[in-house]
C-alpha cells in the first residue's frame, strides 16, 4: 500500500513538473488537440494589417506604419517613440532612428553626417 501511494505521488509530481512541457511539445493528448482558450497568433500575411488599415477612420492623412491620423505625412509619430527619435526631412517626410544609447543630439549629428555623405 505504501508503494502504491509513493508511486502515485511520484506520478502526480512528474505530471505537475513536466505535464505542461509535454503538452506544449506534442500539442496533443489522446489524439485530440487541446484548446484552452489561448489567443491565436496573427496571420503570417498582411491581412491583419489591411483589416486595421481599412477600418481606420481619418479625414486627413493616415500614417501607414502607426495608423495615426495627422495633418501632414511628416507629422506621423514613430511607432516606438520611447526608443526612437523622429527627424523631419526636407522633402516633407520623416525618419525614425533608434536612440541607441547615444548622448543627447548624437543621433541627429550622425544623421546629418550621413545625409551629407560623410559617414
From Swiss-Prot:
Specify whether Electron transport is a keyword of the entry.
no
Which terms are listed as keywords in the entry?
A: Signal
- Which N-terminal stretch is annotated as signal sequence? 1-16
- In terms of domain of life, where is this protein from? Eukaryota
Region of interest (Disordered), residue spans: 29-48
Transmembrane annotation, as ranges: none
Q: Does the keyword Mitochondrion apply?
A: no
Q: Which GO biological-process labels does this protein carry?
A: ERAD pathway
Similarity section: Belongs to the LCL2 family.
The record describes the protein's role as: Probable component of the endoplasmic reticulum-associated degradation (ERAD) pathway.
PANTHER family per record: LONG CHRONOLOGICAL LIFESPAN PROTEIN 2 (PTHR38425:SF1)
What is the official name of this protein in its record? Long chronological lifespan protein 2
Query: Where is the organism placed in the taxonomic lineage, from the top?
Result: Eukaryota, Fungi, Dikarya, Ascomycota, Pezizomycotina
| Protein encoded by which gene | LCL2
